[in-house]
Each structure stands twice: as C-alpha cells, then as structure tokens.
Amino acid sequence: MLSASQFLKHRVSCLPMLNKVESDSTDGDPDDACQHPHDCNIFSVLVNGATDRLEGFFDESDEEDGDEVETPSTTTTAVSPSATMSAPSPTATAPTPHSGTHTPKSPLHSISHCPSFNSVAQALPHSLSPHSLCHTSSHEASRRGSAEQPSRTQSELARRIKTENILNSFHDSLEAAYEKCHGGANPEEHQSNKTEYFQQKLKGFAALDVDEQLIADYPVWLLKNVLIQGHLYITAKHMCFLSYLPRRQNANIRSGTLVKARKRSLREGTRYWCVLKNDSFSYYPDSTDVYFPAGTIDLSEALAAELCDDEGDVTEPESFRIVMPKKSVLFKADSHSAAHEWVKALQKEIFRAHNQGDTVRIVIPLQNIVDLEKTKIFEFATTIKTSVVESNETYAIDEYIFTFFKFGDDVLRTLTENGVEISGGNFSPRQSQLAVGHKHVTESVRDSTLLHASGHHHHFFHSAHHESDGKSNSKSHTSSRSHTPRNLTPQVTGEQPHERDEKRDSKLPRLPKFLRRFKDKVDDKCDDKPTLVPSFLKSRASSRRNSAEGSDRPNLASQRTSSSTLFPSAPPTPGSQPTTPGVHAPGSSTPGGSYGTTTPGTPASADSVSLAGTPGVAAPVGDIEGLNGNPMPAGIAAELKEKRKSGGATSSGAATGATTPGGAAAPGSTGNSSPGTPGGLGGPGAVGAGGPGVMGGAESAPAGTVPQQSHHAGISVVAPHDPAAAAAAADAAAPFTRGPGSGIPEIQDDSDSSDDDHWGHIGTAEVDEDPEQDTFKKKNKRFSTLSKVSDLWSGSTKHYGKHHTERLGDDDDKHLASAEEITESNERFQKRFALGTEERLIASYHCHLHRGGIPTYGKMYVSTNYVTFRSFLRTKTLMIVPLKVVENATKDSGFKFGYSGLVLTIQGYEEIFFEFASASHRDDAEVMLLRQLDIIRPHINDDIKSDDQYMLQSARLCTYEDALKAEANVEMPPVIIDGNLASVLPGLVTPQSKMLFTLLTIGSRGDVQPYISLGKALIEEGHRVRIATHSEFKDWIEGYGIEFKEVAGDPSELMKIMVDHGVFSVSFLRDAASKFRGWINELLASSWEACQGSDVLIESPSAMAGIHIAEALQIPYFRAFTMPWSRTRAYPHAFIVPDQKMGGSYNYLTYVMFDNVFWKGISGQVNRWRKKTLHLPRTNLDHMEQNKVPFLYNVSPAVLPPPVDFPDWIKITGYWFLDEGSKDYTPDDKLCRFMEKARNDGKKLVYIGFGSIVVSDPTALTKSVVESVLKADVRCILNKGWSDRLGKKDAKEPEIPLPEEVLQITNCPHDWLFPQIDACVHHGGSGTTGAGLRAGLPTIIKPFFGDQFFYANRVEDLGAGIHLRKLNVSQFSKALWEATHNERIIAKAAAVGRQIRSENGVISAIQAIYRDLDYARSLVQKKRGYTPTSDKEEETWTLVDDIERQMQDEVEKHNL
C-alpha cells in the first residue's frame, strides 16, 4: 500500500516523461495509475489537471431555476493530485463536435473525462481516507486547545491537499449539486438536464443570450505572457475562455532581500527587504519594520518584469527590472535562480493585477473571428492562433493563442462547422485586413485581462446578459468614469515613420528569451513584416501596428485604453453608425481617394480623430503620431500630408464641419454638424483644421516663430500662431473647461497636489484660452492653492462616504466631501499606496506621526481594510497597516500642549502614536477606526486558505514549468494553474534519483532533535537518511527508523567546559585546546567514516569536519544550525553576546573574530587530516568560502527575523519540531491530578526545567527554585535535568524535600505539556525556546552557556519573556510573578505563538534543499583541484596527487 508521500512522488516523477504518447482511451483500471507511475506522462498530468477544475465560476446560485444549490466558495483550490493522477475512463472516447443546429448528447468533454470522487477515493490507501484525516480523540483535542500545531510533514500535507482538492473539484461539486437536485431521472434525460444545467450557469457567468446553446467544452491553456489553465466553451454564437484565479488577500507571496539600484546602476544600490503581495511590490529598510515601506510599486500599472543583462554575466543574469509606463526599477538578487524566481512571481502577479476580478473571462463572438491558424509552438500540443476583430469601433485585430494537449483537431472542426474560416497559415497580412473589411461585426470581444491606460478595467460583465446590437459595450464604456489615456499628447516631429518606430520599439520592454525564440520562428514564416506574430510575442503597440497597419488606438503595452475614436485598418460596411457623440464613424474610401466621410451628427474632418475621453475634440493626424504613438496608415498619412502642403482643401473642409467624397467642403455646412454635437466643433478654426489652423499653424507660421503651448482643462495641443485661430480654438474647447457653468467639476484636491500633474495632464491635449477665462482660471487656482495650504496646516478632516457618518445626519456632516472629490481622492489614494481598485477611502486627517521620538507631519487615511499615513514637507515616511492587525485605538494626551493623541495597538508590534491639533479631529478618527474594525473583524479569516494547500500548489506549479522546460528545451512562460494562489516559493521538485542524506551533528539532545524531525520528512520524501552523532543517542534515533553512525565525543564533557566558562573567551580556548586536541582528531576521523557513501551532507557547523568531507566526496554540502553563525550586522555572534547592544559594526566584527580564532585553533589538525586522510591540499578561510555555503536556520522568523544583509542562499526556515506528544504518549495520573488541582485552586501553572545542563551545586539550585515558587504563589512542574549528568546522587531522588506546590517529573513531551500551562522557565536552548513560544507561553530564560544568552536577549527584545541574569530568590520570584500576571507579556507571547504555529519549518527546509541543490554542488566542484597560492611547492604536486588518487580509485573499482 502506498503512503501519501509516495503517492505524490510517483505523480511528480511522471512529469518529465514527455516523449511518451498517450492514447485517448485506457483499457486498464484507472486506479492502476497510482500503482504504475511510469505508465503516466505529462499528457495525462496536464490534461487531467486541466479538465479537473473550473471551480468558482458558477458559485452563485442561479436565480432563474430557483434552486438553492450549494456550490464551492471562491476560495482558492489547486489542481487535485488525485484528479491529475487518474487515468481517463475506459469508456471515454474523443468527443465529436456538433454544429449549432444539432443538440449534442454530451457537449461537456471535461465532464465525461473527470474522475468521480468515489473512483479516486477507491484509489487512495485506507490510511488516506477522509475519515482518517479527522480522527482525533476529544481528550487530546481538549488538552491542546488553541495552541495545537500538529506535525505537518510532506505525507500529511499530501493527505490534506488530496482530500480538499477532490471535494473542491469543480466538476465533482457541480455534478454533486446537480445530482442533489435532479437525481433519479433516466440516463438520457439525466444527461440532457445536466447539459442544460451547465448551459444556464455558463450564460449567467459569460453574459450570453438566453437561448444560446452550448456546443462543446474543452480543456485548454491560454498562452499570453503567462500560461493559464482553463476551459474553452463553444456556443452557437461565442467562444468563451474561463479560468479561475482567486487571490489571497494581504498574503505575502514572496519575500527576500534584493539590492535596489540607484541612478540606473547597480554599483550604487541599497539592500532592502522586499515583499511581493497581490497588487503591490514593496521594499523595506528592515524585515521587522513591515508597516513602513521605503517604497511601493503598484503592479496594476507595471507593464512587465524581466531579467536584464548584468555587466559581468549575460548568460545567467542576477538582475531584473520592473517596467513602468515612465521608468524601470532595477533590482539585483544574489543568484540567477533567485532573480528568475522573482521574475516569474512578478509576471504572475502583474497579470493578476491587470485581470478584472478573480476570474479570467474572454468572450469572443464567432462572427469576429477573422482567421484560425494551427501553429507548432510546442511539439507535444496543438496550438491554435485565433485572429479576431476587437470591436466595430476600432476594427483592430487581436490575437489569442490557445494550446490543446487533447482535442485540438476537434476544436477546429467544431468551429468550422459553425462558420469560422481556417486559413491554415496561408493568409497574408493584407488578406487579413481585407477580411476585416468584409466582416459584419455587431459585438465586441470582452476580455477581463485588458485595462484602461489609467489602470481601470472595462466593466464588460456587469449585466447578466449582454446586448447584441453593438451598443452594449459602448454603454459600459461611457457609463464608467472616463480616464484620460497616457502618452496621448500629439507631437509635431520631422522624423520619418520608420525612425519613430525604431525609437519607440527601443523603449518598449525587451522580450524574454523564450518569447524572442518564438518570435524568430514565426518571423521566418511570414512573407512581409512579422505581422502575424502573436500579440504575446511582441508588445501590444508593435503587434497592432504591424497587423493592422495603423490601427491607431490608445494602448499601454498590454493594457487597453478607454473607448475612443480611431481609424480602422479597413473601411467597415456602409451605414455603420457611431455609438457615442463626437466619435467618428469609419468612413469609406471613394474614387477620389478621400477617407473619413462623415455621417450626420458626427463632427469630423478628413484629417482629425477625436481624443479619448473628450467627445468631439479632434486632433490631427498625418505624419504626426496617433493617440498611442502609432503611425497612421501609409495611404492616409500621405494624403493628409499632401493636403497640408496645399493648405486649402483641408482647411475649408474642416471649417464647415463636413466633407464631400472628394474632400471639399459640403455646401451649406455650418459649424454645428448636428444638434447633438456640443460646442460647434466643426465650426471655423475647429481643432484639427489644416492650413493656418491649430496644428497647421506649426508649419505655416513665419520663420523664426515658435508655436506656443497652453494648458486648459487638461487638454493639450500646440497653440497656433494666428490669434484668430487661437480664439476660435478657445471657443471650441470652452464647453469642456472645468469651472462654473462648464458641466465639468473642478478637481478638489485633498492636499495631494503633488499628483495633479500626473493625473490631470498626462496624455491630454491643451488648447489656448481667452483672456477672461484665463483670468478666472488664475483666480480660481489661487483660491484652490490657499484652500489647500489652509487645510494642510489647520489639520482638516474629510469623510468620503455618507454611510460612514451614521452618528450625524447626512446634511449635518460638515466634513463630507463632494462626489467628484471622493472619486479623485480614491484614485490618488489607491495609486499612492498601491492597494488596488477595490480599496475605498473612508476618512482622512492631518496629524503628526511620532516614530522614534520624532514627530512627522502628514496625513492619515482610514480605508476599508487599512490605516495609512504619508508625510509632507519633503520627508518620505510611508505607513501601511492592515486593520486586521490593529487590536485597538485609544485616546491619549499629546506630547505638545493643546494637542490630542491617538494610540494604535498593533499585534506583535509597538504602539503607533498620532497627534492631532484638535480633540474633535482625534475623536472623529477614533470613531472611524473603531467602527471599521467592528466591520472587518468577522471577515478577517474568510479568505485564508490552508497553508499546506498553499504550499503544495506552488510545488505543483514549479513542477509543471520545470518538466516542460526540461523536455521541450524551451524557456517556458510562468504557468498559472486553474485554482492556484500563485505562491512562488521554490517547489517541492523531488530529484529523479533517491539520495542518501547524512546529517552530522554534535552536542546535547537539543542539538540532535531537529535533525530527527528533518530526517523523518526526508524519509517520507523517499530518501535514505543517516544521522551521525554521539553514541548515547543511538536508540532514540533508530526508534524513528533512521540510520545511525557514531562520532567521537562525550556531550557531558563538552557542556561542562562551556558551563564553566559561560561564553567564548581566552580561558575557554586555552582549556579547550589542552583537553580536546586529541578529541578533535578522533572527531575528524570518525566523521569521515560516518559520511562514506553519502549523496548530500547537512552538518551543524560546530562539527567542524563537514565542509572538508563534502569537498573530498564531491557532494552538495549544507549547513544547518539553531543560532546565528552567518555574518550580519543585525545580531552578534551567539557565542559573543555583549551585555548591552553595541551596534551593527560590532555585531559584524564578532563573526569575523570568531571565524579567525576558531579556525586558528583547529587549522593545524584539520590540514594534516585533509592531506593524510582526505588526500586534499591545505586550505584556508578564503578557500573554504564558508559565507557562500547554503545555510538553513531551524529557527522561526518571528524569533530571528531575517536580516537584510543575508544572501539568498541563507534561509530562516522555521523550527523543526519533533512532536513526540502525539506518539502514543500517556501522561502520568499524578501529573494530571496536580494540574487539575492547580486549576481548581485558581493558581498559575509554571514549568521549570533547565534541560541536560551540568551545574556544580545541584542542591543549591533546587533550593532557590523551590523558595521562588512559594514566594510567587504559583504551582510548579519541575524537570530536574541538572542532576542527570555528573551528579553524585541519584537524579530521581530530590536533594531537598519538595512541597506540594512543586511536582517533580522526569521527561514529558513539550508539545503535550506546554499548551496546558501558563508560563515556562528554562535555560534558553533553541528547541525549548521554540516549543514554549509556539504554545504562546511567557518565557523566563536563565542562560548558562553558548547561544542561550543570545535567545534570552531575543525573547526579552520581543517582549514575550524575561532574561533572568541571576538566579536568586528575589529576582526569580519577581520574574515568575511578572510572567504570569503582566498582560503585555502574555499578549505578546500569544502573538508570537500564532505566527510560529502558522509556519512549517521542515517543509520550508526541504524546499530550500531542493532549490539550492545545484548551487551547493557547483560550490564543491569549483574547489576541485584548488591549491592555495601561498604554498607553491604543494601546488606543483597537486595534479600528481589527484592523478594518483584517481588511479587508485580505478584499481579498487576493478579489483586489480
């Protein structure tokens, strides 16, 4: 019977087998797939994974059928391992496509191939059944309470994820819901009803017509800049792609240290702690100060994330950039793999940020499809490139790349039977454009992944059903608030079109390698320019320019601008009407060569095109770049250029507002082309007129004059030289000027004036103003400026919603902002703090933030989920605090006279203090905060998923990418699997061959215990594990099924000398050198013997031999330890802890000093051992490169926050707990009665135990403990380990009589005992410290030696305990009372416990090992054959030494 980990590993091992061909049907039992992993291949994994899930699409009940069906919530699920591993049903056959007139028996292909829950459950071992997962005795559950944290090894992880995913599978759940409501029908009626049920759900979700029939359903992958798993639904009129991409709110997707470049050079950079979340990328000066970022990047505005070439290494760059509309931000990682992982994570999150909502919905009308081309991008899949007309307004061609691992030919057949033509790649670019001209398009493509240029989505899917008359999309565009696209300012330039294209292309984001490779392949197939290159292979602007030859549409890389009037690439059908006032209808070419014939009610000129977001305002074209920077069609541009040179016809035509087919003015035309055209934009001097008009004046102005520019109402054009034309232009734009009577409200800034230029003038056109309006504008601007300054210094308060001011009547709230101001302020707030478009501003206050004793003046914002702050007056303080971590907001007095204070209590953080100039403002802020806290607290955990599920999804995600990359030999785009949370932690990619891990350590029981936990998890991964340590731990280690090898040394002697000296000192070195010189030789020899045959070596650095053994064996080498051993400025070396904090320079110096002194003491013996036993040359500190060795710290990040100066290969994984309490432990009845009596008496329970330390006077220590317990009035559970070693008396017999308030025990598992007591006292060992804090216990630490002093300081710095420097009755009793009664310490310890319980250090360690395995191997290989240059004599003999050793190996190998 397979274990859960084996079940998972077999599936992972199947992934790289791409060369096998999978048949569509299987003759054997589908459950046999679990027993024969080598029969699987990537096809079965990917296809079944794709067909397994479309969860979350139809989670709302259908109101039309009136059934209350329980469907899965929108929480995230992953591709079920069980589903992906199940072979197709033996009866499943390839689906037969059907036309729209014939009703198929079963159009849902994925349903017919989806394994049911029962069949998958039968394939599971009995131990993995859902029943077994819930089995926990009520007694044990009641004992552990909230502090329970079971051991989550890979086996348990696989069990939980498997069951949850089976239950949450879309098809299983939807079928189950259907069976619940419609069960009992005959088979034919049953299938018909099921198809109708799915159709109804699809119509509501994709906004289709009520009578539209579902024809077929296929699993598919959409290839954009990421690879997205989803489903393709073909109906009678549409082709719909649906995929579920839920998000985990406020979750850290990836974090680590990066160097941020300054001045575009990595030579001048600052190292930051960087955190990637759903919609933002933030960097912090310190990993502990996570509420005050140094900067935040809004990913909804990011264009791309890509690797960039380093100055030193182009093949494996360690740098990457985040491309923004106006700049690029450069970062440098510590390794190429780390940079690659950051880029993959950023690409996924940028895509999610651009997508509308948590689902990818693309609805393509079949009538819009211009061409279907079957291409060969992947050798193992069918790829279909679909060219579609975007809308009847732009007639631009979009391209969608769909990849099918099955049913590719069936999809083509189904589409052709529904009237879609297939070119087979024979269409030229010109033929594609001609095909567009003959298309009768009445609908627009609806794509949730495309944005406005301002970062806001089109709301395509608001209504349940869309309109099919071609107007619905326009309504949706105009109903939402219009945003001015960026980079739309027309510019007069003398450059040739091809020169502008080259410059523009050079500024576009550079394509990744895998895209450039695909691009080159496609370019070779094209006759002309690479016009048929898919849009994901080139920038959106470049693709649109080449494919449509001048589809002049505003765009921002892959983002889409708001609906605006643009020239189509080919004339539409005659009679088409514009959908919005002031928008040009596509004209038709005439024999006279004129283009752009206008229709009634449409202001137009032959050479103008209206600006986005401003109805009726036109801008010229010609050789001037269009709204998105793309050139006009060549024929139109040449014609308009010729007209401007002639100077007559265009001007006349534009002045009258209409043109004849020949381009002349229509007789009798007036300035107002129709009653519906505002402002008479077709009148004399209208914007866009040629000759001496607005733009024409730039060419016709006298020599030596420079056209002026003016700003008015956010519209920007080059002002004419002719005053009359200028006045006419001002009159034309007057109705669109902000101000009284204009109809456009004046923007009211909430003192965020720094962003006005960005939001008000980017990408807009400017027109001149008349003197009266200019005077009014200046006065209004002065008044607005004075108002802002007054608000800035008076500490004003503003509310941004009536529903948040219940304590006042709507008419009485003097702080309520206007509707326009609410909109503008929300936009600026969302942009500044990068919190997403769903975050809404509630209130804002001017106040001081006190941080580090220094007041900083700025503005505090309260939003739906955050309280934020930004500073004024040239400072850069930024604060972002989620409301879910705010425990309370309380009033306080201010530091300055007359000021009022507000204190925010934060979970696991220091209080944040605000100071207000007025008590009323402070009170208002308190009310708003507390009210919002009451609103969100019931929903804090609504979107939180299981950490196990979150982790395994990312593992599967990386496995898909790595497998495809390995077999297809191409650089794959990042993969987003349906239902994935996009965690980018390094995946659990199990090595193809099982390995022997040797774990080498010395010391006490606490030093060995973490390695047992790691060894158990590695065994469940399928590897062999060996622990090499002292002989007294042999039975304990072998009891867990782990191999044991002995190394020399007596732990008791080691601890005695360390206790005697306490810390690392000169006397310690002198005694150690005299007593342990012989022991070091034995340790080195025994360690070498214990590591023979190992494939990977993980060593505690205190063992001293591991790095040399790994070099001799040429195997990957890792270090793992419980205390700081790597150089950093954040903490001192654990053996050299000062009495007071000495700063970063001193901390770093302690590591340098320790490394040199430690190596000086053992270097002679080590080098002799290397030469004699290992046959290696002498070495030194520089050659060993210890700082480059991958390091695993088995400590929680809550206790040891990662320093910013730690490189990427140093990981703080979390504690490696060995939960022995869950291993059939039965507590002593005497202990249970003692604990119950203490509870009944209302006394606090305290555990006191100092581990296996050695003390000189055990009786005196016991006496001090007993007297302190009695004085503090607590009950004590005493574990007297200090008498177990080197004592004269029996350790089980007490030295002094113990009172009834004290119960002595021998051994009791910490994971069983600690959740049931109130505080703990111990020696400060890493394992005991972690166990106590995990249970949320206030901790008292009395250190004796080594790292215990370090952890005593850390616990005290965290506020979760007390560092007891002297163990006497007075100080110990006081500490006991503080730990059991101080609410501040109790609350802080509970917060740290919650964080530790959310971690899984063992799984994180295995992830780090797998990820850094190649890196560790490269370090060892680089050292091979090295000889220090300081010893030239030995250097000459190095090669001979190596040859002799190799020859000896060959002789022994062949038994010669």
Curated annotation (Swiss-Prot):
Provide the topology term for how it sits in the membrane. Answer: Peripheral membrane protein
Query: What chemistry does it catalyse, as a reaction equation?
Result: a sterol + UDP-alpha-D-glucose = a sterol 3-beta-D-glucoside + UDP + H(+); ergosterol + UDP-alpha-D-glucose = ergosteryl 3-beta-D-glucoside + UDP + H(+)
Its principal location? cytoplasm
Q: Does the keyword Cytoplasm apply?
A: yes
- Domain PH residue range list: 251-351
List compositional bias (Acidic residues) regions by residue number.
60-70
Would you identify the family this protein belongs to, as annotated? Belongs to the glycosyltransferase 28 family.
Q: What is this protein called?
A: Sterol 3-beta-glucosyltransferase
Question: Which organism is the protein's source?
Answer: Yarrowia lipolytica (strain CLIB 122 / E 150) (Yeast)
